[in-house]
Amino acid sequence: MADGERSPLLSDLGDGALGSGNGGVSPGAASLGAPNKPQSFPPFPSSTQPPVLLSENPPPYSPLTSPESGSAPVISCRVCQSLISVEGKIHQHVVKCGVCNEATPIKNAPAGKKYVRCPCNCLLICKVTSQRIACPRPYCKRIINLGPVHPGPASPDPQPAGARVSCGHCSNTFLWTEFTDRTLARCPHCRKVSSIGQRYPRRRSLWCYLLCLLFSISAAGLIAGTWSQAQVYGGIYASWAAALLLVVLTLARALYWSCMRVSQPLHNLT
Protein backbone atom coordinates (compact mmCIF):
# COMPACT_ATOMS: atom_id res chain seq x y z
CA MET A 1 0.00 0.00 0.00
CA ALA A 2 1.22 3.54 0.56
CA ASP A 3 4.86 3.62 1.60
CA GLY A 4 4.93 6.98 3.33
CA GLU A 5 6.45 8.97 0.50
CA ARG A 6 4.26 12.01 1.10
CA SER A 7 6.81 14.83 1.12
CA PRO A 8 5.59 17.50 -1.30
CA LEU A 9 7.74 18.42 -4.26
CA LEU A 10 5.89 21.73 -4.56
CA SER A 11 4.84 23.44 -1.37
CA ASP A 12 2.17 25.66 -2.84
CA LEU A 13 0.42 23.17 -5.16
CA GLY A 14 -3.33 23.38 -5.13
CA ASP A 15 -5.00 20.75 -7.24
CA GLY A 16 -1.81 19.58 -8.92
CA ALA A 17 -1.26 16.65 -6.62
CA LEU A 18 1.63 14.32 -6.30
CA GLY A 19 0.97 10.83 -5.01
CA SER A 20 3.28 8.04 -4.09
CA GLY A 21 2.87 4.39 -4.85
CA ASN A 22 4.67 1.14 -4.56
CA GLY A 23 4.38 -2.17 -6.28
CA GLY A 24 0.76 -2.59 -5.19
CA VAL A 25 -2.16 -0.21 -5.01
CA SER A 26 -1.44 3.04 -3.22
CA PRO A 27 -4.82 4.24 -1.94
CA GLY A 28 -3.20 6.77 0.37
CA ALA A 29 -1.24 8.67 -2.30
CA ALA A 30 -0.60 12.13 -0.93
CA SER A 31 -2.16 15.18 -2.51
CA LEU A 32 -0.33 18.50 -2.24
CA GLY A 33 -2.89 21.05 -1.19
CA ALA A 34 -6.65 20.92 -1.01
CA PRO A 35 -8.11 19.73 -4.36
CA ASN A 36 -10.61 21.85 -6.22
CA LYS A 37 -14.22 20.79 -6.45
CA PRO A 38 -15.22 18.54 -9.34
CA GLN A 39 -17.29 21.26 -11.04
CA SER A 40 -14.19 23.42 -11.55
CA PHE A 41 -12.23 20.45 -12.82
CA PRO A 42 -10.71 20.90 -16.32
CA PRO A 43 -11.94 18.62 -19.11
CA PHE A 44 -10.22 15.33 -19.79
CA PRO A 45 -7.57 15.27 -22.49
CA SER A 46 -8.69 14.85 -26.08
CA SER A 47 -8.46 11.55 -27.92
CA THR A 48 -5.16 12.60 -29.46
CA GLN A 49 -3.55 12.68 -26.01
CA PRO A 50 -3.41 9.40 -24.03
CA PRO A 51 -5.34 9.57 -20.74
CA VAL A 52 -2.49 8.11 -18.68
CA LEU A 53 1.03 9.30 -19.42
CA LEU A 54 3.49 6.81 -18.02
CA SER A 55 6.95 8.02 -17.00
CA GLU A 56 6.10 11.55 -18.06
CA ASN A 57 9.22 13.59 -18.75
CA PRO A 58 9.37 17.35 -18.21
CA PRO A 59 8.72 19.45 -21.32
CA PRO A 60 11.61 21.47 -22.75
CA TYR A 61 11.89 25.14 -21.97
CA SER A 62 10.19 27.29 -24.56
CA PRO A 63 12.12 30.19 -26.12
CA LEU A 64 8.93 32.21 -25.97
CA THR A 65 8.43 34.80 -23.27
CA SER A 66 5.55 35.19 -20.90
CA PRO A 67 3.77 38.56 -20.87
CA GLU A 68 3.83 38.63 -17.09
CA SER A 69 7.50 37.80 -16.65
CA GLY A 70 9.14 39.63 -19.52
CA SER A 71 12.07 37.50 -20.69
CA ALA A 72 11.61 34.74 -18.09
CA PRO A 73 11.74 31.16 -19.42
CA VAL A 74 8.38 29.50 -19.80
CA ILE A 75 7.06 26.03 -20.50
CA SER A 76 3.73 24.77 -21.77
CA CYS A 77 1.26 23.23 -19.36
CA ARG A 78 0.80 19.55 -20.06
CA VAL A 79 -2.95 19.82 -19.41
CA CYS A 80 -4.23 23.09 -20.93
CA GLN A 81 -1.13 24.07 -22.98
CA SER A 82 -0.96 27.48 -21.28
CA LEU A 83 2.43 29.13 -20.74
CA ILE A 84 3.89 28.78 -17.25
CA SER A 85 6.77 30.94 -16.07
CA VAL A 86 9.52 28.99 -14.32
CA GLU A 87 11.52 32.01 -13.17
CA GLY A 88 12.71 31.42 -9.61
CA LYS A 89 11.30 27.85 -9.66
CA ILE A 90 14.22 26.01 -11.24
CA HIS A 91 14.91 24.21 -7.95
CA GLN A 92 11.42 22.69 -7.95
CA HIS A 93 10.48 19.47 -9.68
CA VAL A 94 7.04 20.63 -10.77
CA VAL A 95 5.25 23.92 -11.27
CA LYS A 96 1.60 24.76 -10.96
CA CYS A 97 -0.41 26.15 -13.87
CA GLY A 98 -2.28 29.31 -13.02
CA VAL A 99 -5.07 28.50 -15.49
CA CYS A 100 -6.02 24.88 -14.74
CA ASN A 101 -4.26 24.58 -11.36
CA GLU A 102 -2.61 21.32 -12.45
CA ALA A 103 1.05 20.39 -11.96
CA THR A 104 3.57 20.11 -14.79
CA PRO A 105 7.05 18.63 -14.23
CA ILE A 106 10.08 20.76 -15.06
CA LYS A 107 12.68 18.28 -13.84
CA ASN A 108 13.12 14.58 -14.16
CA ALA A 109 11.60 12.56 -11.35
CA PRO A 110 13.88 11.77 -8.40
CA ALA A 111 16.01 8.66 -8.60
CA GLY A 112 13.89 5.53 -8.51
CA LYS A 113 10.65 7.47 -9.15
CA LYS A 114 8.54 8.30 -12.18
CA TYR A 115 5.68 10.63 -13.04
CA VAL A 116 2.23 9.33 -13.93
CA ARG A 117 -0.75 11.52 -14.85
CA CYS A 118 -4.19 10.26 -13.88
CA PRO A 119 -7.08 10.63 -16.37
CA CYS A 120 -8.38 13.33 -14.02
CA ASN A 121 -5.14 15.27 -14.80
CA CYS A 122 -3.69 14.77 -11.32
CA LEU A 123 0.10 14.39 -11.55
CA LEU A 124 1.34 11.49 -9.44
CA ILE A 125 4.84 10.36 -8.55
CA CYS A 126 5.53 6.73 -7.75
CA LYS A 127 8.30 4.17 -7.73
CA VAL A 128 9.55 2.91 -11.05
CA THR A 129 8.64 -0.61 -9.91
CA SER A 130 5.01 0.30 -9.22
CA GLN A 131 2.45 -1.65 -11.21
CA ARG A 132 -0.72 -0.11 -9.80
CA ILE A 133 -1.34 3.20 -8.08
CA ALA A 134 -4.46 4.94 -6.82
CA CYS A 135 -5.36 8.56 -7.44
CA PRO A 136 -5.57 10.42 -4.11
CA ARG A 137 -8.34 12.81 -5.16
CA PRO A 138 -11.50 11.95 -3.23
CA TYR A 139 -13.75 12.40 -6.26
CA CYS A 140 -11.55 10.26 -8.54
CA LYS A 141 -9.93 7.34 -6.65
CA ARG A 142 -9.06 5.63 -9.92
CA ILE A 143 -6.80 2.59 -9.87
CA ILE A 144 -4.19 3.08 -12.60
CA ASN A 145 -2.65 -0.11 -13.95
CA LEU A 146 0.89 0.53 -15.12
CA GLY A 147 1.59 -3.04 -16.22
CA PRO A 148 4.81 -4.98 -15.80
CA VAL A 149 7.91 -2.90 -15.28
CA HIS A 150 10.29 -5.13 -17.20
CA PRO A 151 8.30 -6.86 -19.93
CA GLY A 152 10.19 -9.73 -21.44
CA PRO A 153 9.64 -13.03 -23.15
CA ALA A 154 7.06 -15.15 -21.44
CA SER A 155 8.51 -17.82 -19.24
CA PRO A 156 8.10 -21.33 -20.62
CA ASP A 157 5.16 -23.28 -19.31
CA PRO A 158 6.13 -25.54 -16.42
CA GLN A 159 6.33 -29.18 -17.24
CA PRO A 160 3.14 -30.89 -16.11
CA ALA A 161 3.49 -33.22 -13.14
CA GLY A 162 1.93 -36.62 -13.32
CA ALA A 163 2.19 -39.80 -15.33
CA ARG A 164 1.30 -40.87 -18.82
CA VAL A 165 -1.36 -43.55 -18.71
CA SER A 166 -2.39 -46.08 -21.33
CA CYS A 167 -6.18 -46.27 -21.45
CA GLY A 168 -7.62 -49.71 -20.67
CA HIS A 169 -10.42 -49.20 -23.23
CA CYS A 170 -8.87 -47.63 -26.33
CA SER A 171 -5.14 -48.02 -25.50
CA ASN A 172 -4.52 -44.32 -26.21
CA THR A 173 -2.08 -42.44 -23.99
CA PHE A 174 -3.13 -39.49 -21.83
CA LEU A 175 -1.72 -37.53 -18.89
CA TRP A 176 -3.15 -38.08 -15.42
CA THR A 177 -2.12 -36.22 -12.27
CA GLU A 178 -4.65 -37.13 -9.54
CA PHE A 179 -3.18 -40.20 -7.95
CA THR A 180 -4.98 -41.18 -4.74
CA ASP A 181 -6.27 -44.36 -3.13
CA ARG A 182 -9.53 -43.84 -5.04
CA THR A 183 -8.21 -43.13 -8.51
CA LEU A 184 -10.61 -43.36 -11.42
CA ALA A 185 -9.64 -41.71 -14.70
CA ARG A 186 -11.77 -40.68 -17.66
CA CYS A 187 -9.95 -41.03 -20.93
CA PRO A 188 -10.08 -37.80 -22.99
CA HIS A 189 -10.16 -39.86 -26.20
CA CYS A 190 -12.93 -42.42 -25.65
CA ARG A 191 -14.53 -40.68 -22.61
CA LYS A 192 -14.73 -43.99 -20.73
CA VAL A 193 -13.84 -44.46 -17.06
CA SER A 194 -11.12 -46.83 -15.97
CA SER A 195 -9.07 -47.45 -12.85
CA ILE A 196 -5.42 -46.48 -12.48
CA GLY A 197 -4.08 -49.76 -11.15
CA GLN A 198 -5.99 -52.82 -9.92
CA ARG A 199 -5.92 -52.21 -6.18
CA TYR A 200 -8.92 -49.90 -5.91
CA PRO A 201 -11.48 -51.85 -8.00
CA ARG A 202 -10.37 -55.13 -6.47
CA ARG A 203 -10.96 -53.82 -2.96
CA ARG A 204 -14.34 -52.36 -3.89
CA SER A 205 -15.50 -55.57 -5.56
CA LEU A 206 -14.48 -57.59 -2.49
CA TRP A 207 -16.55 -55.36 -0.20
CA CYS A 208 -19.54 -55.59 -2.52
CA TYR A 209 -19.32 -59.38 -2.65
CA LEU A 210 -19.25 -59.53 1.15
CA LEU A 211 -22.29 -57.26 1.37
CA CYS A 212 -24.08 -59.35 -1.22
CA LEU A 213 -23.37 -62.49 0.82
CA LEU A 214 -24.62 -60.80 4.00
CA PHE A 215 -27.82 -59.58 2.34
CA SER A 216 -28.38 -63.02 0.76
CA ILE A 217 -28.18 -64.73 4.15
CA SER A 218 -30.49 -62.11 5.65
CA ALA A 219 -32.98 -62.44 2.80
CA ALA A 220 -32.96 -66.24 3.05
CA GLY A 221 -33.54 -66.10 6.80
CA LEU A 222 -36.33 -63.54 6.38
CA ILE A 223 -38.10 -65.63 3.77
CA ALA A 224 -37.74 -68.85 5.77
CA GLY A 225 -38.90 -67.24 8.98
CA THR A 226 -41.94 -65.50 7.55
CA TRP A 227 -43.09 -68.05 5.00
CA SER A 228 -46.19 -69.09 6.93
CA GLN A 229 -47.09 -65.55 8.00
CA ALA A 230 -46.86 -64.35 4.41
CA GLN A 231 -49.88 -66.48 3.57
CA VAL A 232 -51.94 -64.28 5.88
CA TYR A 233 -50.20 -60.89 5.76
CA GLY A 234 -49.47 -59.83 2.21
CA GLY A 235 -47.23 -56.95 3.33
CA ILE A 236 -44.48 -59.42 4.18
CA TYR A 237 -43.89 -59.91 0.46
CA ALA A 238 -42.75 -56.28 0.28
CA SER A 239 -40.02 -56.96 2.86
CA TRP A 240 -38.93 -59.98 0.80
CA ALA A 241 -38.72 -57.81 -2.28
CA ALA A 242 -36.63 -55.19 -0.46
CA ALA A 243 -34.20 -57.81 0.81
CA LEU A 244 -33.86 -59.39 -2.61
CA LEU A 245 -33.36 -55.94 -4.18
CA LEU A 246 -30.42 -55.28 -1.84
CA VAL A 247 -28.92 -58.61 -2.87
CA VAL A 248 -29.26 -57.79 -6.57
CA LEU A 249 -27.82 -54.27 -6.17
CA THR A 250 -24.76 -55.37 -4.23
CA LEU A 251 -24.17 -58.21 -6.68
CA ALA A 252 -24.38 -55.79 -9.61
CA ARG A 253 -21.87 -53.42 -7.99
CA ALA A 254 -19.53 -56.29 -7.26
CA LEU A 255 -19.67 -57.38 -10.90
CA TYR A 256 -19.16 -53.75 -12.02
CA TRP A 257 -15.96 -53.37 -10.02
CA SER A 258 -14.73 -56.81 -11.00
CA CYS A 259 -15.15 -56.05 -14.70
CA MET A 260 -13.74 -52.50 -14.63
CA ARG A 261 -10.95 -51.91 -17.11
CA VAL A 262 -7.55 -51.00 -15.69
CA SER A 263 -5.31 -48.30 -17.19
CA GLN A 264 -1.60 -48.78 -16.66
CA PRO A 265 0.84 -45.90 -15.95
CA LEU A 266 3.72 -45.74 -18.42
CA HIS A 267 6.33 -43.44 -16.84
CA ASN A 268 6.46 -40.45 -14.52
CA LEU A 269 7.09 -36.87 -15.69
CA THR A 270 8.20 -35.53 -12.31
Curated annotation (Swiss-Prot):
<feature type="compositionally biased region" description="Gly residues">
    <location>
        <begin position="16"/>
        <end position="26"/>
    </location>
</feature>
<dbReference type="InterPro" id="IPR019178">
    <property type="entry name" value="PtdIns-P2-Ptase"/>
</dbReference>
<feature type="active site">
    <location>
        <position position="126"/>
    </location>
</feature>
<keyword id="KW-0472">Membrane</keyword>
<dbReference type="GO" id="GO:0034597">
    <property type="term" value="F:phosphatidylinositol-4,5-bisphosphate 4-phosphatase activity"/>
</dbReference>
<dbReference type="Pfam" id="PF09788">
    <property type="entry name" value="Tmemb_55A"/>
</dbReference>
<feature type="transmembrane region" description="Helical">
    <location>
        <begin position="232"/>
        <end position="252"/>
    </location>
</feature>
<protein>
    <recommendedName>
        <fullName>Type I phosphatidylinositol 4,5-bisphosphate 4-phosphatase-A</fullName>
        <ecNumber>3.1.3.78</ecNumber>
    </recommendedName>
</protein>
<dbReference type="GO" id="GO:0005765">
    <property type="term" value="C:lysosomal membrane"/>
</dbReference>
<keyword id="KW-0967">Endosome</keyword>
<feature type="short sequence motif" description="CX5R motif">
    <location>
        <begin position="126"/>
        <end position="132"/>
    </location>
</feature>
<keyword id="KW-1133">Transmembrane helix</keyword>
<dbReference type="GO" id="GO:0030670">
    <property type="term" value="C:phagocytic vesicle membrane"/>
</dbReference>
<dbReference type="GO" id="GO:0046856">
    <property type="term" value="P:phosphatidylinositol dephosphorylation"/>
</dbReference>
<dbReference type="GO" id="GO:0031902">
    <property type="term" value="C:late endosome membrane"/>
</dbReference>
<keyword id="KW-0812">Transmembrane</keyword>
<dbReference type="GO" id="GO:0005886">
    <property type="term" value="C:plasma membrane"/>
</dbReference>
<keyword id="KW-0378">Hydrolase</keyword>
<feature type="transmembrane region" description="Helical">
    <location>
        <begin position="206"/>
        <end position="226"/>
    </location>
</feature>
<feature type="region of interest" description="Disordered">
    <location>
        <begin position="1"/>
        <end position="71"/>
    </location>
</feature>
<keyword id="KW-0458">Lysosome</keyword>
<comment type="function">
    <text>Catalyzes the hydrolysis of the 4-position phosphate of phosphatidylinositol 4,5-bisphosphate.</text>
</comment>
